[in-house]
Amino acid sequence: SNNELTNEERNLLSVAYKNVVGARRSSWRVISSIEQKTEGSERKQQMAKDYREKIEKELKDICHEVLTLLDKFLIPKATTAESKVFYLKMKGDYYRYLAEVATGDERQKVIEESQRAYNDAFDIAKNQMQPTHPIRLGLALNFSVFYYEILNAPDRACHLAKQAFDDAIAELDTLNEDSYKDSTLIMQLLRDNLTLWTSDTGGDDDANAPDEHQ
């Protein structure tokens, strides 16, 4: 059938996968930092490495499953600007999660895919959605995290986040009653990241992972 998912179904799908992949991303970060601290004990380092690779495989499998769903079914069937942006953002997110664990040529490839999906989503969002729309704001939030964390481009990250925040502030009167809470929450997260990034002196990043949207 040609039926698109409803908003609620779309959100449930997104949250379900976000929880599954989120657990792996957290584990991967923890085990990677443990691995770095075990230099000097070959046995411990090997155990950490084996476990990291196991988590990596699970994380990659989940991401590829989501990306297949998006490319084969969800994106081709999306008819509204809202659903197109939602799914393209999701595609950018899952390639970004792959980029977090990938290395070498593979990393370059997934970074390009992530950036392309975010850019495509951003073009549609800017032309067809209010700056206060939670999906447009969530996209700006995650795209700016991509610039900061994956491309190591803090200036671009801050510019994108600030622009999205300022554009939303300028049109606060367009805030939809139904999505008021979502929109203002994401605006707060954009501000939090800007504060974090403009004060970041390159200390211990683990404690200061930026905020993301589902």
From Swiss-Prot:
Pfam families noted in UniProt: 14-3-3
SUPFAM superfamilies in the cross-refs: 14-3-3 protein
Domain of life: Eukaryota
InterPro entries membership: 14-3-3 (IPR000308), 14-3-3_CS (IPR023409), 14-3-3_dom_sf (IPR036815), 14-3-3_domain (IPR023410)
Family statement: Belongs to the 14-3-3 family.
Official protein name in the record: 14-3-3 protein homolog 2
Organism encoding this protein: Schistosoma mansoni (Blood fluke)
